[in-house]
């Protein structure tokens, strides 16, 4: 390992510490070197009764105790512990293998309790902890068999290579190299934890770079929110459309009912008969009705001829013309009846104006009733004429004149039959 470290370039971010600040390093390194070297023949001769392996272990423990007692006044371990201070910074993973031929170069070994306390209480490492991430980023990751990372504080790990090398150096140092992962090599006190560092890197990468097939939770929430709003907006629009459609259906139904009542032939026939009777009762001729329509001031409606009113009453107009003329004649009839009521309420105002008596026209039903009464009694009394007039809603004078005219008619018919 000494030769391997001497061939590698140094990427230290900070200047290396001079060796003259550590005067007690040589004694501790000498003690550890004695522990690592084979037992001399002289010692085997002096302690022939003891096993050589037990002696070697005892000397190793003594060397470790010396190193611990001397290392309490120094924040860093001796040069011999790390083989060289210029190549690798102090980390919790780079300790001297006591049995060098039994350990692979990339295995991590735990620190002794005294060394761990020294590293934790070191003020230099406390200052370097803040720059751990920057050191790891600047140190970079080594290749598979190269050094683990840069030599700066908080940079890459020790000289261990391979896929698991290149761990983060120092507390807070990031992962270095392709084998470091997010959990650096110094953060793995156990060899199994070192493999977890490699597993954590793709997991974090997958968390950082989400696959395109899985949408972001925020985007999913936003899409759900807009979808609900959209759904809500679509439901409100559907309710408005349904309400408007229902109103349109109701309006169409009402209009259809009105149109049906207006366009029903039986309704038109009943109105035409009613209009004729009320017109006769008012004493107005068909020509007067046609000329009076211009006084209604209805847009697009002027005076009509007498033949048009006659055809309306006799139902000989076309169906569309009957439908168009019905509201006009109804308006005139209401106005004429209103004027008639006013005239009856104030008869003195209209007596001077009536000079010519209008010819009375009797409707067919009333005419048939009068003919039936005439067949029974051609000469009724005055009381009988008054009762007939009241029953048929006609004037008494009209009924009297009709009976008189009917007798004259029958006389002419008899005279023509005789001669």
Curated annotation (Swiss-Prot):
Belongs to the POU transcription factor family. Class-4 subfamily. It holds the Pfam family Homeodomain. Residues 356-415 bind DNA. It is found in: Nucleus; Cytoplasm. The lineage of its organism: Eukaryota, Metazoa, Chordata, Craniata, Vertebrata. Its main location: nucleus. One of its GO terms (molecular function) is DNA-binding transcription activator activity, RNA polymerase II-specific. GO terms for cellular component: chromatin; cytoplasm; neuron projection; nucleoplasm; nucleus; RNA polymerase II transcription regulator complex. CDD domains: homeodomain. Expressed in the brain and the retina. Present in the developing brain, spinal cord and eye. InterPro entries: HD (IPR001356), Homeobox_CS (IPR017970), Homeodomain-like_sf (IPR009057), Lambda_DNA-bd_dom_sf (IPR010982), POU (IPR013847), POU_dom (IPR000327), POU_domain_TF (IPR050255). The gene is POU4F1. This is POU domain, class 4, transcription factor 1. Residues 261-338 form the POU-specific domain. GO terms for biological process: axonogenesis; cell migration in hindbrain; cellular response to cytokine stimulus; cellular response to estradiol stimulus; central nervous system neuron differentiation; habenula development; heart development; innervation. Residues 99-108 have a biased composition (Basic residues). A motif (POU-IV box) lies at residues 57-66. The C-terminal domain is able to act as both DNA-binding domain and a transcriptional activator. The N-terminal domain is also required for transactivation activity on some target genes acting as a discrete activation domain. Neurite outgrowth and expression of genes required for synapse formation are primarily dependent on the C-terminal domain, however the N-terminal domain is required for maximal induction. Keywords: Cytoplasm, Developmental protein, Disease variant, DNA-binding, Homeobox, Intellectual disability, Nucleus, Transcription, Transcription regulation. The keyword Protein transport does not apply. Residues 94-117, 131-197 are annotated as: Disordered. It comes from the Eukaryota.
């Amino acid at each position: 390992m000494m030769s391997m470290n001497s061939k590698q370039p140094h990427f230290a971010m900070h200047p290396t510490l001079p060796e003259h600040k550590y005067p007690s390093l040589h004694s501790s390194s000498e003690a550890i070197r004695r522990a690592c070297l084979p037992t001399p023949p002289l010692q085997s001769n002096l302690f022939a009764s003891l096993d050589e392996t037990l002696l070697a272990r005892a000397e190793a423990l003594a060397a470790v105790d010396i190193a611990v007692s001397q290392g309490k006044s120094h924040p860093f371990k001796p040069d011999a512990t790390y083989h060289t201070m210029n190549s690798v910074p102090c980390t919790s993973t780079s300790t001297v293998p006591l049995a060098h031929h039994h350990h692979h170069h990339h295995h991590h070994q735990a620190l002794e309790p005294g060394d761990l306390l020294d590293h934790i209480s070191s003020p230099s490492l406390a200052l370097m902890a803040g720059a751990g991430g920057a050191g790891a980023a600047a140190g970079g990751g080594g290749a598979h068999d190269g050094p683990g990372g840069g030599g700066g504080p908080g940079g890459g790990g020790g000289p261990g290579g391979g896929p698991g090398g290149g761990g983060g150096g120092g507390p807070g140092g990031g992962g270095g190299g392709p084998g470091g992962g997010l959990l650096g090599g110094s953060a793995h006190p156990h060899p199994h934890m070192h493999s977890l560092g490699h597993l954590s890197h793709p997991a974090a990468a997958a968390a950082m770079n989400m696959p395109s097939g899985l949408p972001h939770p925020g985007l999913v929430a936003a899409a759900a929110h807009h979808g609900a709003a959209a759904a809500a907006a679509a439901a409100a629009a559907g309710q408005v459309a349904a309400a408007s459609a229902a109103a349109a259906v109701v309006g169409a139904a009402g209009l259809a009912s009105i149109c049906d009542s207006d366009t029903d032939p039986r309704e038109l026939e009943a109105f035409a008969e009613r209009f004729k009777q009320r017109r006769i009762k008012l004493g107005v001729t068909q020509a007067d009705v046609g000329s009076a329509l211009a006084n209604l001031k209805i847009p697009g409606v002027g005076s009509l001829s007498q033949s048009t009113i006659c055809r309306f009453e006799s139902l000989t107009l076309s169906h569309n013309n009957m439908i168009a003329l019905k509201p006009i004649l109804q308006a005139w009839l209401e106005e004429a009846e209103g004027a008639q009521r006013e005239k009856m309420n104030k008869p003195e105002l209209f007596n001077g104006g009536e000079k010519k008596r209008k010819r009375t026209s009797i409707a067919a039903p009333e005419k048939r009733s009068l003919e039936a009464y005439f067949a029974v009694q051609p000469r009724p009394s005055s009381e009988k004429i008054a009762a007939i007039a009241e029953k048929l809603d006609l004037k008494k004078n009209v009924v009297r004149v009709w009976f008189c005219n009917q007798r004259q008619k029958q006389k002419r018919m008899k005279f023509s039959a005789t001669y």
